[in-house]
Amino acid sequence: MPCPGRLLLERIDPIVDPGEVSGHVHTVSGGSGFGFNTTFEQQRDSACSSCPIKQDMSAYWTPKLYWMSEDGNSFEDVPQAGEGEGVTGGMTVYYQQRGPDPSNLTAFPEGFRMLAGDPHQRNDTGLEAAPGKAVSYVCLDYSGATSHPETGNMPDYNCPNGLRAQLYFPSCWNGVDLDSEDHRSHMAYPIGEYNNGRCPDSHPVQLISIFYEVIYQTNLFADRWWSDGQQPFVFSQGDRTGYGFHADFVNGWDVDVLQKAVDECTNDSGRLEDCPVFGELFTNDECQACRLPQSVDEELTGNLTSLPGCNPPTDGPEYATAQSCNTPEISSPTQYFTNMIQSVGWEYQGCASDDIASRTLTGGFTWSDDMTVQHCIDYCKGEGFILAGLEYANQCYCGNDYANQDAAPNPDILGNCWQPCAGNDQEVCGGSAALSVYKSCDGGACSNAVFHVNGTESTSSSSGDSSSSEKRKRHIHKHAHGHAKFH
């Protein structure tokens, strides 16, 4: 299952640190019900997912990778495959029928969650597990000019098309516990091989197997290697080796649908479309529009002087120990709109989708290299329209209704509106095929569409408070630049 979009980049881990800021940064894909406190019910209630299967609102996450200067005083986030201006990079989640009897596999039960790997591991355990052989790396060269074997750690050579990190989860369940104190003990790897084989008697229930792949664009740093030949990368928990790669999973499936797919979708093509159980899928644009705003006020991307949190880089082979320091609080999520209620009596409706072949707002149109939210509202108001939509930084569309109601803003979907306005880079003016929409209150009640994240503070929908505005200013620029198998 290719998850083309990223739901969230945040110091968040509701399995290990529920209700708290996590120790290190994670990249999250999956259902929008995700938050600092995440339950199965909240995941199932997700309005969208950055992954394509509509019956799957699970959450999948892994640590963020950074480039590190040789003197250890500078860090930069490494983009994932597919990442670019206004577009987030995702991951691939494989669902595989493995084991001695693939016809007798069980879907993840409601409320199930697990963790694989150990963020503090810094050497090779040699185990058929994670940490161990279930964690691996592939140096990508699509030209075929170079060929390297899989490694258990991050290699000390450049990969022409990036580095792929891989993790295989345990597939044997004790049949009782949906989680455990260490979030691992309720699960076990098969006997003999981490990705196949019979389950031990202690964990007799063979579940469907899942396997994560994340491609990091390490090739973008090919000319910034360390002078001694060492690779210059570090995971967000301070892991310079790669042995500490880890991953989390919170089930958000319609369990009956997953079980039906496990039983019936045996086509070896790996194409989701070849599994009729799933029916209609989310499009790539819908996956990209499914995002969550940051709720911890700290910089996670760009040029950093240290890794977020207390994560000094370590090379091992000693087991790393967790560090503690001052941690910012969870606050209200960053909001990506300008409060126009007091000034002109227009409310923010949300982020609508748009299509060049079938416009969402079909009234007036103007564009300007000095475009701002105020500029667009003034134009549409002057032309007699009650809706003003900003797109692609410098465009303004007007209307009195949405030509396509399916494209109208959904208050539960944040959307792909991240682009700084051409005339004021502290404001958001939509995005690619995405409209930041404002509506005239016409003297009536006014209320901005404020986006909420599970486990965060609420924010007044009409105040547009200054703290949210300041956070938006600090974070807006990072957003602007910035194989499923059932066999």
Residue ranges of predicted features:
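Serine/threonine-rich, low-complexity intrinsically disordered segments
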Residues: Y137, S458-S461
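Residue-level preference for alpha-helix termini and adjacent loops
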Residues: P14-I15, G111, S171, T360, ...
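A short, local hydrophobic-aromatic micro-motif
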Residues: Y168-P170, Q349
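N-terminal, immediately post-signal peptide pro-regions of secreted/luminal proteins
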Residues: S463-S469
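Peripheral, non-catalytic regulatory segments
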Residues: Q323-T459, E470-H487
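Primary mode marks residue(s) on the alpha4-beta5-alpha5 output face of response regulator receiver
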Residues: M1-G23, T27-L167, N174-Q342
